[in-house]
């Protein structure tokens, strides 16, 4: 009996590990912009990697896509309604389902990237409704008007958060006078916990999960605070008023435009925002019960294109104004700026197979870049011509295919074979 019980426990543990590894979400498995790929091309033909297909019927979207081993998931806005589109690997639409109303602010196009685990898809609408869609049944399993229910408060440009799954919980940050962050049961939508209120406004950043000191800590930003929350019970472990750290003298309102997902590695946490507000590195201390500031950097004030860590360096773009920015490299350990280089304008960045993938936001130029602290070394580049609007969506790489979203269009490129 003991032997069989032991076997069952092993099976359960392995099953939980498989489930944990199967989540497809915002900016990759660890939400840090690094995609676990190998065998990708180290240079491209003059016109770029081979374009496999284009689907231009997604609806308007600034959100990225999530890709599983079975399907592709994308959110899009038609008129004032948000839809989930599910595609096969030839770019054909398998099905489509409306799940909520879009935001009422400027740039109302979808911002939330679907979070997919098994046959469940989680989304946050532009008006703060948290939704679970059952892909097997192709219908909404549950929905919670969370922004309304928890009396949330959002900043000027609305809601842009992508939901985080932690164990059996869906995490959302409505902020406001009642709470700051909430956890919903991922199977039912029932409230598991809600944190105390910091009496603040939600940012445009998405949360991450870190493991430190034997704790699971959920980290996110409001417009003023960086906070760490105990994933088990929703207690706020620590918070820091980021907006008070070297507040820009020219753009006094700017520190509240936090769009960058916190970047974590080995006990250290980096945050940044645009408009001349400094990036800050923190160190977790006291078994995760506190954090302390390590360094600041005034060069890499990333607007909304995100940052990525490769080796001991952080890469991303800074903000010069809303139309321009340069490509930067900063030392993870010291905060020293290694370079600041001009290449068209600011944009998005991810990493895979020890290369950087850089997507500038105005003209759609896309580059394969060698990560180096010495220079912004472009190996190959091409231009994205399909779609419409700003090139703000984060690229995704899955099983050797590069997915680029531009407005209503999704393009798939082969990164494993060269054209003859």
Task: Describe the role of every protein-language-model region.
Residues 81-84, 180, 228, 277-282, ...:
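Structural motif
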Residues 364, 388-420:
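Blade-level signature of beta-propeller repeat domains, shared across WD40, Kelch, NHL, RCC1
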């Amino acid at each position: 009996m003991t032997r069989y019980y032991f076997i069952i426990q092993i099976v359960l543990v392995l099953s939980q590990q498989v489930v944990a590894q199967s989540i497809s979400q915002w900016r990759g498995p660890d939400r840090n912009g690094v995609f676990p790929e190998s065998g990708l091309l180290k240079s491209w033909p003059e016109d770029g990697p081979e374009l496999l297909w284009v689907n231009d019927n997604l609806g308007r979207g600034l959100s990225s896509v999530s890709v599983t081993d079975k399907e592709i998931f994308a959110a899009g806005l038609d008129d004032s309604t948000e839809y989930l589109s599910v595609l096969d690997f030839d770019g054909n639409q398998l099905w489509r389902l409306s799940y909520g109303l879009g935001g009422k602010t400027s740039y109302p196009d979808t911002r939330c990237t679907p979070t997919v685990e098994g046959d469940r898809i989680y989304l946050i609408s532009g008006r703060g409704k948290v939704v679970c869609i059952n892909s097997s049944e192709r219908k909404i399993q549950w929905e919670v008007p969370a922004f309304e229910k928890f009396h949330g408060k959002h900043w000027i440009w609305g809601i842009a958060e992508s939901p985080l799954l932690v164990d059996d919980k869906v995490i959302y940050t409505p902020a406001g006078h009642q709470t700051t962050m909430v956890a919903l049961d991922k199977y039912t939508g029932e409230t598991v916990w809600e944190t105390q209120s910091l009496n603040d406004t939600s940012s445009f950043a998405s949360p991450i999960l870190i493991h430190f000191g034997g704790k699971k800590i959920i980290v996110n930003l409001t417009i003023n605070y960086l906070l760490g929350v105990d994933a088990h019970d929703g207690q706020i472990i620590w918070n820091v008023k980021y907006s008070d750290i070297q507040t820009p003298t020219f753009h006094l309102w700017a520190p509240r435009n936090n769009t960058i997902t916190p970047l974590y590695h080995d006990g250290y946490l980096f945050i940044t925002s645009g408009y001349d507000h400094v990036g800050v590195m923190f160190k977790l201390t006291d078994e995760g019960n506190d954090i302390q500031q390590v360094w600041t950097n005034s060069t890499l004030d990333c607007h909304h294109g995100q940052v990525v860590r490769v080796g001991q360096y952080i890469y991303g773009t800074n903000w010069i104004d809303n139309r321009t920015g340069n490509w930067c490299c900063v030392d993870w350990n010291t905060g020293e700026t290694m370079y600041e280089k001009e290449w068209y304008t600011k944009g998005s960045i991810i990493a895979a197979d020890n290369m950087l993938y850089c997507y500038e936001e105005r003209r759609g130029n896309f580059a394969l870049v060698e990560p180096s602290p010495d220079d912004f070394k472009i190996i190959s580049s091409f231009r994205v011509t399909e779609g419409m609007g700003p090139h703000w969506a984060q690229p995704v790489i899955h099983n050797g295919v590069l997915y680029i979203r531009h407005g209503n269009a999704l393009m798939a490129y082969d990164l494993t074979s060269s054209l003859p």
